[in-house]
């Protein structure tokens, strides 16, 4: 996302929570020449034109553009808790922090709460000398504290919600089969789809936050019955358990964006989730 996008996101940086007449007029002008292919409900059209404020209108507009790009025809409700991939307070993410500030000023948050990927450094378990801590805290991740304030204002579940594996019981963000999710973390998306039977596309960072705030996501690809059908059958015939990274890379390079069905791993890892898996 270009840095200048942070200045007003799509232009004007004024926030409207309730939507005065002038707010709605400005939003209507902003979206006057905005054409899209998705079929929106009357309520969704009203949101796009400012019924829930200018910032929510921008969220809706972004998701409509996202849906159009992938051929989605409609929105579907999100019924699982959110999970964010962006967890580092690193300076190159300043545009992200500015967008989050705008969401907060607009009074928006994730009502159901969300989890987020791990913090950059685990000082309790990874020992660092004073110089290393200084570099990490002041230079590399100098915006971590202020970013976590933003996360809390937007609906972070708790201080224990930093993990890539949000689906574990102790974290409390375990989707059910058939749940529609708005996630971006690649490993969690794969686990949710393949193990838990939930439905989630590999969204990009911030897009997944927008979907959780709106409570809806564009319906395409892995959210549809057709999009979940495997186009490849991959049979693993190696004499010993393959390295996960090598196997995943080999399959990915072959199938690209298609859905594979992988056979032959159960003789090593079984069919149940255990520590050995």
Task: Identify the role of each PLM range.
Residues 13, 17-277:
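Non-transmembrane, aqueous-exposed alpha-helical and coiled segments at domain scale
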């Amino acid at each position: 996302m270009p840095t200048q996008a942070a200045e007003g996101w799509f232009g004007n940086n004024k926030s409207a929570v309730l939507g005065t007449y002038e707010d709605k007029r400005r939003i209507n002008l902003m979206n006057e020449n905005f054409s899209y292919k998705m079929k929106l409900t009357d309520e969704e059209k009203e949101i796009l034109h400012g019924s829930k404020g200018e910032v929510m209108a921008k969220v809706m507009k972004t998701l409509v553009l996202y849906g159009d790009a992938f051929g989605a025809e409609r929105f579907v409700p999100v019924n699982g808790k959110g999970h964010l991939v962006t967890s580092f307070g690193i300076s190159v993410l300043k545009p992200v922090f500015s967008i989050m500030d705008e969401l907060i000023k607009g009074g928006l948050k994730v009502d159901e709460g969300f989890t987020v990927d791990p913090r950059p450094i685990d000082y309790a378990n990874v020992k660092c000398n004073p110089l290393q801590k200084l570099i990490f805290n002041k230079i590399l991740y100098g915006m971590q504290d202020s970013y976590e304030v933003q996360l809390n204002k937007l609906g972070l579940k708790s201080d224990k919600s930093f993990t890539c594996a949000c689906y574990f019981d102790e974290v409390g963000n375990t989707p059910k089969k058939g749940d529609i999710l708005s996630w971006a973390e690649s490993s969690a998306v794969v686990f949710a789809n393949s193990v838990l039977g939930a439905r989630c596309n590999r969204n990009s960072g911030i897009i997944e936050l927008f979907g959780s705030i709106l409570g809806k996501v564009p319906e395409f690809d892995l959210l549809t019955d057709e999009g979940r059908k495997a186009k490849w059958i991959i049979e693993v015939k190696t004499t010993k358990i393959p390295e996960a990274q090598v196997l995943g890379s080999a399959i990915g390079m072959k199938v690209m964006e298609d859905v594979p069905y992988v056979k032959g791993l159960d003789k090593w890892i079984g069919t149940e989730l255990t520590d050995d898996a």
